[in-house]
A protein has these predicted regions:
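Conserved double-stranded beta-helix
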Residues: 108-221
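Structural motif
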Residues: 84, 99, 164-166
């Protein structure tokens, strides 16, 4: 029986839904990449304001015989706007299930015609817009994609013959209302590393928002 397994790279223990945990002091290059000028520049241009890092995940999907959950077409939760960055860690093709989405404008038609609630079958979506509208993210390891998964109807990996491994970043606006998946545990990272760069420190604002008495590395070391 296959499925999707996520490692929350911003959580420092196993109290979240994540299958794993990480100390970013051991892997500073991950956060350096997430808040690099190139990445933040794209997110800022789309969102129209300073982007805030909401997620950093590593997803592994193992082969499955039938579609479940996010293998069906859906929209992400109704945030006003968000932007996700996906990078293939290994080559992606039809055998390990490409991330598949429909651009924002035809996705609006899907939302209206299907009267969207929850998940949708391929048949429901393609009755609203032609199947030719879909875009499949395939290619060699290192290839990357940006998509607003709140506005673009999409589905995750339908791996059939081999595993798929993807690295994901989520960027939201400073007024994002939902609690991040790492809210109840501190994110262990070197806060001093980013303090001199105003854009980076703002992008990492959620990492220090924890219940009283908890916080990022800089709060207790």
């Amino acid at each position: 029986m296959g499925g999707r397994y996520g490692i929350n790279l911003l959580a420092s223990d196993k109290e979240t839904w994540s299958r794993g945990a990480i100390d970013l002091r051991d892997f500073p290059e991950l956060l350096d990449f997430a808040v690099s000028d190139e990445i933040l520049g794209v997110a800022a241009e789309y969102l129209g304001e300073v982007p805030v890092l909401g997620e950093m995940q590593l997803y592994v999907t193992t082969p499955m015989q039938k579609n479940v959950g996010n293998n069906f077409y859906h929209f992400d939760k109704p945030y006003s706007r968000q932007l996700k960055f996906w990078m293939a860690v290994e080559d992606v093709d039809a055998g390990n299930g490409p991330f598949t989405f429909i651009p924002a404008e035809p996705s609006k038609i899907v939302r209206e015609k299907v009267r969207y609630v929850g998940r949708m079958t391929d048949e429901e979506v393609y009755a609203a817009v032609p199947e030719s509208e879909k875009i499949e993210f395939t290619g060699a390891a290192g290839n990357a994609l940006w998509a607003d998964t709140c506005r673009c109807v999409h589905f995750g990996s339908r791996a059939r013959s081999r595993n798929r491994v993807m690295f994901e970043l989520q960027f939201v606006t400073p007024f994002w209302w939902a609690e991040p998946t790492f809210y109840f545990v501190p994110t262990l990272y070197d806060a001093e590393r980013y303090k001199r760069n105003r854009m980076q420190s703002l992008a990492l604002k959620l990492l220090s928002k924890h219940p009283p008495g908890e916080g990022h590395l800089g709060d207790y070391e």
